[in-house]
């Protein structure tokens, strides 16, 4: 069976969409974001399509597109709907990899009763945890790692995003007992070519396919 990976984060806006674009492009994968909250600046799927270089048919349609950039449970309430977690089943396996991106951080509520991490636990797919490198990331990252391990979710490792703070990265991986997958540096301008080159330089693709 082809590689199927979940990408989540220690927090919102840590850079997991940019990382997902890089990973999906490098794997020549399909990409799926089951829940999109907020659409004023375009969807994450459109951003991944632009940055990954993947053809349009590789960007799979969202199950829910919510109008408000907020926690999915609240954004759905504003739109007058409730997210049914039974709708959040990964697409059938194909002969190519699949990258699934969550919304916000691991512990973001989908509805009044379920967190995203609960859905990930049900799927039992390997998870890549994205973390920022700035002040506060040690606490956020270790709490996230503990939550993933407590639910027996297979953890591929942690991908850092941001400037180089080697000591923070080292101590997170040592205490958390997780693999350091690499660090995606800030890119300006952020272009598909620059992202592809940075990913190839910073990560070992075999770490995601083993």
Swiss-Prot record:
Database matches in SUPFAM superfamilies: P-loop containing nucleoside triphosphate hydrolases
Residue sites binding Mg(2+) per the record: 17, 47, 101
One term under GO cellular component: cytosol
Top EC category: ligase
Record-level GO BP terms: biotin biosynthetic process
Cysteines joined through disulfide linkages: none
Any one GO molecular function term: dethiobiotin synthase activity
Keyword Phosphoprotein attached: no
Signal peptide: none
Catalytic activity, EC: 6.3.3.3
Keywords of this entry: ATP-binding, Biotin biosynthesis, Cytoplasm, Ligase, Magnesium, Metal-binding, Nucleotide-binding
Origin superkingdom: Bacteria
Record keyword tRNA processing present: no
InterPro entries: DTB_synth_BioD, P-loop_NTPase
Residues at which ATP binds: 13-18, 101-104, 185-187
Cofactor: Mg(2+)
Coarse class of the protein's main subcellular location: cytoplasm
Residues the record marks as active site: 33
Reaction(s) this enzyme catalyzes, per UniProt: (7R,8S)-7,8-diammoniononanoate + CO2 + ATP = (4R,5S)-dethiobiotin + ADP + phosphate + 3 H(+)
Listed CDD domains: DTBS
Record pathway: Cofactor biosynthesis; biotin biosynthesis; biotin from 7,8-diaminononanoate: step 1/2
Family: Belongs to the dethiobiotin synthetase family.
PANTHER family: ATP-DEPENDENT DETHIOBIOTIN SYNTHETASE BIOD 2 (PTHR43210:SF2), DETHIOBIOTIN SYNTHETASE (PTHR43210)
Function, as annotated: Catalyzes a mechanistically unusual reaction, the ATP-dependent insertion of CO2 between the N7 and N8 nitrogen atoms of 7,8-diaminopelargonic acid (DAPA, also called 7,8-diammoniononanoate) to form a ureido ring.
Record's protein name: ATP-dependent dethiobiotin synthetase BioD
């Amino acid at each position: 069976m082809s590689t199927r990976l979940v990408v989540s984060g220690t927090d919102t806006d840590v850079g997991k969409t940019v990382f997902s674009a890089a990973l999906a492009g490098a794997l020549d994968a399909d990409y799926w974001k089951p829940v999109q909250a907020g659409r004023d600046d375009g969807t994450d799927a459109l951003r991944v399509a632009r940055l990954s270089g993947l053809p349009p048919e590789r960007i799979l349609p969202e199950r829910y597109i919510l109008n408000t950039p907020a926690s999915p449970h609240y954004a759905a309430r504003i739109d007058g709907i409730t997210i049914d977690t039974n709708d959040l089943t990964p697409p059938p396996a194909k002969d190519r990899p699949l990258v699934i991106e969550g919304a916000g951080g691991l512990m973001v509520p989908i509805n009044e009763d379920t967190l995203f991490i609960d859905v990930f636990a049900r799927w039992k797919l390997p998870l890549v945890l994205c973390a920022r490198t700035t002040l506060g990331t040690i606490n956020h990252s270790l709490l996230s790692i503990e939550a993933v391990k407590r639910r027996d979710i297979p953890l591929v490792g942690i991908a850092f995003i941001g400037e180089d703070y080697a000591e923070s990265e080292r101590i997170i991986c040592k205490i958390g007992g997780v693999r350091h997958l690499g660090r995606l540096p800030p890119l300006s301008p952020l272009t598909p070519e620059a992202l592809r080159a940075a990913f190839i330089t910073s990560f070992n693709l075999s770490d995601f396919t083993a």
